[in-house]
Regions:
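Acidic, glycine-rich loop-and-beta core segments that form the ion-binding/anion-interacting portion
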Residues: 159-213
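Residue-level "contact hotspot" at macromolecular interaction interfaces
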Residues: 143, 159-161, 179, 196, ...
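Glycine-rich hexapeptide-repeat left-handed beta-helix
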Residues: 204-310
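Terminal amphipathic alpha-helical/low-complexity segments used for targeting or macromolecular assembly
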Residues: 1-147, 289, 294, 300, ...
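A structural connector/turn signal
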Residues: 9, 157, 175, 192, ...
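Hydrophobic beta-strand residues in large extracellular and virion-surface proteins
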Residues: 36-38, 49, 58, 150, ...
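Short, flexible loop segments at the rims of nucleotide/cofactor-binding pockets, characterized by
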Residues: 13-16, 179, 196, 262
């Protein structure tokens, strides 16, 4: 995945934090860090690091010529395969000059394996898998903000984090592990299962959302079904729309990438909807489809191999 100013490390959020910020915060719990070196293309990453870690120096390098030699405790964002570091290896790293990770990566600690895990985020389904893992690993109890409003008729089942300003209407069911970001609204009779919903996500009446990620500031009308999908920021979904997530033959879902169909390795995968898209009423998005940012899909469309967008 190429480095860019709006890469997943800066555009995606985990528990309300940009991915790159959460990565550094996690690494800092185990490593002494006083400098972070990022590719020149990742301009947003520099801004985020400076805002959140003013005491950490930030440098940039040309990704075509990465020769950083210094004596500081450094995170250098380069590229390699996924791996884990056990406690002994973490102690060893603290004595080294540099610690290199891909810019589009996810760093998290596994209590079960007693290791710092570093997973590259290459494909959308990689991110969905990691979101499910981080929900399970990080949400062990239900934490509800005193500033949240939950109807007495609604059910919170399993561990959930419900942030400030969240409103959950009557007869809803929230099944954990689930995270609901600040200022979000869940409409009457909706079912939310194993999801991460960014801030100011608005879910309408009688919707089902399962194993999905919403970037935030998204709005859904009534009776929608979103399954195993990644929804970008500022998306509008009209009523009676949804993402199909399984093929009738139950084979692995294939995803179009650069004109080629890539086997996802999984048989449950919905759609990837880019930022600021508008999806009309009664639209069905077939499994493994990508809706580019700023697209408009007219009402009644079946969004499949022959894409119909404006």
């Amino acid at each position: 995945m190429a480095d860019c100013s709006d890469c997943p490390a800066t555009s995606l959020k985990v528990f309300g934090q940009p991915l790159i910020v959460r990565n550094i915060q996690t690494a800092k719990e185990f490593l002494d860090i006083d400098k972070v070196v990022v590719p020149k293309e990742s301009t947003n990453a520099v801004k985020l690091i400076e805002e959140n870690f003013p005491y950490i120096d930030v440098e940039q390098f040309s990704s075509s010529n990465n020769n950083n030699n210094n004596d500081s405790r450094t995170i250098t964002t380069t590229a390699f395969h996924n791996y884990l570091l056990n406690s002994n290896e973490v102690r060893t790293l603290n004595k080294k000059a540099e610690f290199e990770v891909p810019v589009n990566t996810f760093i998290h600690y596994s209590l079960e394996r007693a290791a710092l895990l570093i997973d590259a985020v290459i494909y959308p389904w990689d991110f969905l898998k990691l979101i499910q893992k981080v929900l399970c690993d990080n949400i062990k109890d239900t934490i509800i903000s005193p500033n949240a409003s939950i109807a007495k008729s609604s059910i919170i089942e399993g561990p959930c984090i419900i942030e400030d300003g969240v409103t959950i209407d009557d007869f809803c069911k929230i099944k954990g592990p689930t995270y609901i970001g600040k200022g979000s609204f869940i409409g009457m009779s909706s079912l939310i299962r194993n999801c991460m919903l960014g801030e100011k996500t608005r879910i309408g009446f009688n919707c089902e959302i399962a194993r999905s990620y919403f970037a935030g500031h998204d709005k859904m009308a009534h009776q929608n079904v979103i399954l195993d999908s990644v929804i970008g920021k500022g998306v509008w979904l009209g009523g009676y729309s949804g993402t199909a997530n399984v093929l009738l033959n139950n084979q692995n879902i294939r995803y179009e990438l650069n004109g080629q169909l890539v086997d996802t390795g999984i048989n449950h995968f919905g759609a990837v909807i880019g930022n600021n898209c508008s999806v009309g009423a009664s639209v069905i998005i077939l499994p493994g489809r990508q809706v580019p940012s700023n697209s408009i899909i007219q009402a009644g469309t079946i969004f499949g191999k022959k894409k119909v967008i404006s």
